[in-house]
């Protein structure tokens, strides 16, 4: 199991060989100081993981996260810690996990004004075809919010997907928007 260190709101894999291994098994994380490596051998620095990626990898048994006191944070503890740091973590994590289980590569979508950028092949191999916004199915979305989501996805030439999470059943439903000229 790969050793990873919790540092605030990030998790670091200091060993470069272990970083390569994790990156090559699904494009997890980003190498410190290297943007969009095309090949795992391009990973020559430690790997930085988001909390969402770390929780997922811990649940899968691929990483062991250790805090500053040397305590191992099992999946449940790491999930609880992340919930305190990230707004709507439960919703975001549920969508992340669902997309990963469906075989997609899921990265942060912050620069696109979304929760996630989603790839079919991977970063560095293609531009992300989708931006995903995770929403509680019981949450109201105003027309203004919907239009602002759409503007960002349209200007970056990505398909906008709303991921609707039902907290009771833990199911995720997706709605994809297609913009047309009239």
Curated annotation (Swiss-Prot):
<dbReference type="GO" id="GO:0003676">
    <property type="term" value="F:nucleic acid binding"/>
</dbReference>
<dbReference type="InterPro" id="IPR006676">
    <property type="entry name" value="tRNA_splic"/>
</dbReference>
<dbReference type="Pfam" id="PF02778">
    <property type="entry name" value="tRNA_int_endo_N"/>
</dbReference>
<comment type="subunit">
    <text>Homotetramer; although the tetramer contains four active sites, only two participate in the cleavage. Therefore, it should be considered as a dimer of dimers.</text>
</comment>
<comment type="similarity">
    <text>Belongs to the tRNA-intron endonuclease family. Archaeal short subfamily.</text>
</comment>
<dbReference type="InterPro" id="IPR016442">
    <property type="entry name" value="tRNA_splic_arch_short"/>
</dbReference>
<dbReference type="GO" id="GO:0016829">
    <property type="term" value="F:lyase activity"/>
</dbReference>
<feature type="active site">
    <location>
        <position position="119"/>
    </location>
</feature>
<dbReference type="InterPro" id="IPR006677">
    <property type="entry name" value="tRNA_intron_Endonuc_cat-like"/>
</dbReference>
<protein>
    <recommendedName>
        <fullName>tRNA-splicing endonuclease</fullName>
        <ecNumber>4.6.1.16</ecNumber>
    </recommendedName>
</protein>
<comment type="function">
    <text>Endonuclease that removes tRNA introns. Cleaves pre-tRNA at the 5'- and 3'-splice sites to release the intron. The products are an intron and two tRNA half-molecules bearing 2',3' cyclic phosphate and 5'-OH termini. Recognizes a pseudosymmetric substrate in which 2 bulged loops of 3 bases are separated by a stem of 4 bp.</text>
</comment>
<dbReference type="GO" id="GO:0000213">
    <property type="term" value="F:tRNA-intron endonuclease activity"/>
</dbReference>
<feature type="active site">
    <location>
        <position position="127"/>
    </location>
</feature>
<dbReference type="InterPro" id="IPR036740">
    <property type="entry name" value="tRNA_intron_Endonuc_N_sf"/>
</dbReference>
<dbReference type="InterPro" id="IPR011856">
    <property type="entry name" value="tRNA_endonuc-like_dom_sf"/>
</dbReference>
<dbReference type="Pfam" id="PF01974">
    <property type="entry name" value="tRNA_int_endo"/>
</dbReference>
<dbReference type="InterPro" id="IPR036167">
    <property type="entry name" value="tRNA_intron_Endo_cat-like_sf"/>
</dbReference>
<keyword id="KW-0819">tRNA processing</keyword>
<dbReference type="GO" id="GO:0005737">
    <property type="term" value="C:cytoplasm"/>
</dbReference>
<dbReference type="GO" id="GO:0006388">
    <property type="term" value="P:tRNA splicing, via endonucleolytic cleavage and ligation"/>
</dbReference>
<keyword id="KW-0456">Lyase</keyword>
<dbReference type="InterPro" id="IPR006678">
    <property type="entry name" value="tRNA_intron_Endonuc_N"/>
</dbReference>
<feature type="active site">
    <location>
        <position position="158"/>
    </location>
</feature>
């Amino acid at each position: 199991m790969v050793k990873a260190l919790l540092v605030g709101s990030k998790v670091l894999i200091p060993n470069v060989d272990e970083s390569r291994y994790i990156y090559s098994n699904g494009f997890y994380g980003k190498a410190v100081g290297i943007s969009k490596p095309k090949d795992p051998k391009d990973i020559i620095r430690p790997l930085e993981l988001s909390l969402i990626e770390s929780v997922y990898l811990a649940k899968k048994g691929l990483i062991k996260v250790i805090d500053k006191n040397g305590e191992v944070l099992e999946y449940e503890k790491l999930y609880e810690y992340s919930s305190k740091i990230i707004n709507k973590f439960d919703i975001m994590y549920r969508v992340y996990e669902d997309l990963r289980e469906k075989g997609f590569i899921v990265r942060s979508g912050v620069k696109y004004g979304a929760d996630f950028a989603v790839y079919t092949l991977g970063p560095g191999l293609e531009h992300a075809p989708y931006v995903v916004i995770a929403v509680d199915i019981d949450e109201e979305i105003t027309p203004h919010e919907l239009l602002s989501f759409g503007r960002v996805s349209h200007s970056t030439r990505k398909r906008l997907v709303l991921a609707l999470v039902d907290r009771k059943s833990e199911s995720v439903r997706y709605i994809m928007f297609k913009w047309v000229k009239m």
